[in-house]
């Protein structure tokens, strides 16, 4: 959200620098992410002066160039070569001096330098309107009125205004601050309470006798009061639609809003002032003289303001002139009802629409307008008339015309806010430090939270309707703390803490731990839809377990997922279509299974996916493509970090995997990993190899060593390392070697790793050579060579007898 520093001063009489203002707003929860200088003409016309052409002669070596002598008030005439056909002696002109920089309306910035043009030196530039960013006109140089004073700074002549724009990262729950007045309310509260500055918070005056009419030609009917709890409107006649005055254009330009015309600009101005969206209709196009707020039949076609046709659904709220739709309520206007240069009479709407209704329509139609986003965050139902009056006063002032109807205000069920009983003592305990009673009262008063009754420790509060995020006592405490200031209390010199031991695992904490582990390895967490297409599932057993939806919103998304693979493949396809090929993804989620008639189960899973390269190409080396072993190492790290050791079993032809591995403990499947079959990838139009792992998260949580926290003293005695090489049958896996080592080492084995694998001509066909490293350590003494040799001899004997290994000795 963009907030103008100068604009904010219209409501709060503060005296802060932009940086200080940013610190205050950030302190009250409106995080200022950036502060950007703004000028109504980019660059502020620094180094640009008003001059007078004293002499003008043809260039000796170019027919289309002129050599001029220009007075800019410095006491010396500047020689400037000019290519404009309309340059002449006696003109007052805009001159850019050497060293200045211009920002044209179109194109790149232009640095003015001393130049020699066809042999004639030039010391500056006589400017056209587009060259200084004033307009897009390039019909020769800009000739000023004869009254212009030579030597005047162009910035002063054109009344260039300077401002600062604060970029605020507004959180979704703060719809009340989604406007200049909303920010001003928080600012004034903080300055008055935390900074004791005694500033005034002033809203625009909207009372006027022009609103005393008692009739209206255009009538309004609201057929759905749930989707539209309040609808306010007014008619204004004999307006002149034209360009907006500079002050209005500049206000909107500062916050990144394009000027359209005076009527539309006023509605946008009030939107960003109050946070209340408005819509102006051409009243003469409302043929029935009746506006109806209702929903239309499924499949109704509507042409929007940008000349695109959309198909409506039965839940889309529309503004109609009888039966014909004119506007998608709160989202987007229609082509045939908007204000144009020919408009003379307008019907101005200011309504309160349900945020849920607007969100569904805007999302389905992919129309993310400013109005829709304000309604989605939540607007104030009790300011529709004030915003309407503000806009009407500005329209009659700027566009001419007069108010020609009463204010229509359909508000059958007034939304006054909600009542909340809180305990002052409990709030102080929750805050963690004492805040005086009168300070709390003052904060609530400035935030427009009314204290209706104080009965000792108990307070009865009336929360205003615009405070949609204040629903409980803890929310009130948050409001108090953010204004009082989290930096207003001092930390004690000593902090005491304990290291708790948990008998029961903290699921969320464990997920966060693993998420941090994977994020540190370059993975990105995704959330995918648990509703999927039943046709995706290829495994027969899982297909029989599918849970079909009875009332699916679409014909394709018709079942709950039995595997998380296919939703992740959709993510891969989406990213690859946007040239994001190299992916490391993970997701915590659930799969859903039908066990029998009316019997279902949910299974928690952690899934990992790799695609593309593990590192990008550079001048020195080519990037390495992900393979099965990359994924295996990541899965192993996850299991080990939970203190869970598994044994591997290779499995073949398990669709949709090409080559896969299952990690098992006590015959329970802990994880399965593999590469996805080309036939499956083809259905998603994925051309790169994809490696996928699915981890039984329920089982890991149940067996995780995080469940019981224990503290172990760091080892005092050194570890001992030994290497062993052996030749084995090709079908024997490393997990068999690891299992024997763990069993035979009597808890002295700390680590076992495979550091070399050989298959080739130097050993018998059907055989392979493993080189394995063992690390041993005793918790209470230093192991002797004799003890190590006993362990190694026992291991070698076991490998020979159980695995048929041939030990390779030096």
Region locations from a protein language model:
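Extended, well-folded interaction surfaces typified by the phenylalanyl-tRNA synthetase beta subunit core
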Residues: 420-424, 428-581, 722, 775-777, ...
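Mobile "lid/hinge" segments at catalytic clefts and subdomain interfaces of large enzymes
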Residues: 118-133, 140-143, 154-164, 317-416, ...
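Conserved mixed alpha/beta core segments that line enzyme active sites in large multi-domain catalysts
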Residues: 49-80, 151, 261, 267-336
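Phosphate-backbone binding interfaces of nucleic-acid-interacting proteins
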Residues: 1-214, 347, 366, 370, ...
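A carboxyl-terminal module marker
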Residues: 2, 446-449, 599, 615-810
């Amino acid at each position: 959200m963009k907030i103008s520093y100068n604009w904010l001063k219209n409501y709060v009489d503060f005296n802060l620098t932009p940086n200080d203002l940013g610190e205050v707003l950030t302190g009250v929860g409106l995080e200022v992410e950036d502060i950007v200088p703004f000028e109504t003409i980019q660059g502020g016309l620094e180094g640009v002066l008003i001059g007078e052409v004293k002499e003008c002669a043809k260039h000796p070596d170019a027919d289309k160039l002129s050599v001029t002598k220009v007075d800019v008030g410095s006491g010396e005439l500047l020689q400037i070569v000019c290519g404009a056909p309309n340059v002449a002696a006696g003109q007052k002109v805009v001159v850019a001096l050497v060293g200045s920089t211009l920002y044209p309306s179109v194109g790149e910035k232009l640095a003015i330098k001393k130049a020699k043009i066809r042999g004639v030196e030039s010391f500056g530039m006589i400017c056209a309107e587009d060259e200084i960013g004033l307009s897009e006109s390039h019909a020769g140089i800009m000739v000023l009125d004869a009254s212009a004073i030579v030597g005047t700074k162009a910035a002063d002549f054109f009344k260039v205004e300077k401002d600062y724009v604060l970029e605020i990262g507004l959180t979704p729950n703060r719809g009340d601050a989604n406007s200049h007045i909303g920010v001003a309310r928080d600012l004034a509260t903080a300055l008055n309470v935390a900074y004791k500055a005694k500033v005034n918070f002033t809203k625009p005056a909207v009372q006027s006798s022009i609103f005393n009419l008692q009739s209206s030609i255009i009538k309004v009917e609201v057929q759905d009061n749930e989707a539209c709890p309040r609808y306010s409107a007014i008619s204004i006649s004999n307006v002149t639609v034209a360009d907006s005055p500079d002050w209005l254009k500049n206000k909107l330009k500062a916050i990144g809003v394009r000027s359209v015309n005076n009527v539309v600009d006023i509605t946008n101005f009030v939107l960003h002032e109050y946070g209340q969206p408005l819509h102006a209709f051409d009243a003469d196009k409302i043929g029935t003289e009746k506006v109806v707020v209702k929903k239309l039949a499924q499949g109704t076609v509507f042409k929007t303001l940008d000349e695109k046709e959309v198909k409506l659904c039965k839940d889309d709220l529309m503004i109609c002139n009888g039966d014909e739709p004119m506007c998608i309520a709160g989202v987007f206007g229609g082509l045939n009802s908007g204000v144009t240069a020919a408009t003379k009479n307008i019907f101005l709407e200011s309504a309160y629409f349900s945020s849920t209704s607007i969100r569904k329509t805007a999302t389905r139609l992919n129309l993310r307008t400013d109005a829709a986003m304000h309604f989605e965050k939540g607007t104030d139902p009790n300011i529709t008339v004030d915003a309407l009056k503000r806009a009407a006063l500005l329209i009659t002032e700027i566009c001419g015309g007069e108010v020609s109807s009463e204010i229509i205000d359909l508000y059958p069920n007034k939304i006054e806010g909600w009542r909340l009983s809180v305990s002052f003592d409990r709030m102080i305990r929750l805050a963690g430090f004492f805040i005086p009673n009168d300070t709390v009262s003052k904060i609530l008063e400035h935030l427009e939270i009314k204290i209706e009754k104080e009965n000792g420790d108990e307070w009865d509060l009336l929360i205003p309707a615009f405070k949609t995020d204040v629903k409980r006592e803890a929310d009130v405490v948050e409001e108090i703390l953010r204004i009082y200031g989290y930096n207003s209390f001092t930390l004690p010199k000593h902090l005491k803490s304990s290291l708790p031991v948990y008998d029961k695992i903290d699921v969320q904490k464990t997920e966060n731990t693993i998420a941090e582990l994977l994020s540190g390895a370059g993975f990105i967490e995704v959330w995918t839809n648990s509703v999927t297409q039943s046709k995706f599932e290829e495994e027969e057993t899982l297909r029989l377990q599918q849970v079909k939806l009875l009332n699916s919103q679409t014909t394709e998304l018709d079942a709950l997922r039995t595997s998380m693979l296919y939703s992740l493949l959709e993510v891969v396809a989406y990213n690859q279509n946007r040239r994001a090929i190299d992916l490391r993804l993970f997701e915590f989620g659930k799969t859903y299974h039908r066990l029998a008639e009316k019997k279902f189960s949910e299974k928690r899973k952690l899934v990992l996916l790799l695609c593309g390269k593990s590192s990008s190409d550079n001048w020195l080396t080519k990037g390495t493509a992900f393979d099965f072993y990359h994924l295996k190492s990541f899965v192993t790290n996850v299991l080990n970090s939970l203190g869970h050791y598994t044994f591997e079993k290779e499995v073949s032809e398990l669709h949709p995997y090409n080559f896969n591995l299952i990690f098992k403990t006590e015959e329970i499947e802990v994880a399965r990993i593999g590469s996805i079959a080309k036939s499956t990838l083809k259905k998603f139009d994925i051309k790169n190899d994809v490696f996928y792992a699915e981890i039984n998260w329920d089982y890991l949580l149940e067996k995780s060593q995080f469940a019981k926290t224990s503290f172990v003293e760091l080892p005092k005695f050194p570890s001992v390392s030994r290497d062993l090489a052996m030749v084995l049958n090709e079908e024997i896996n490393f997990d068999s070697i690891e299992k024997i080592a763990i069993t035979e080492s009597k808890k002295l084995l700390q680590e076992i790793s495979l550091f070399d694998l050989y298959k080739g001509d130097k050993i018998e066909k059907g055989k392979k050579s493993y080189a394995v490293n063992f690390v041993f350590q005793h918790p209470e003494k230093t192991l002797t060579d004799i003890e190590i040799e006993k362990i190694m001899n026992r291991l070698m004997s076991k490998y020979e007898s159980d695995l048929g290994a041939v030990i390779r000795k030096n």
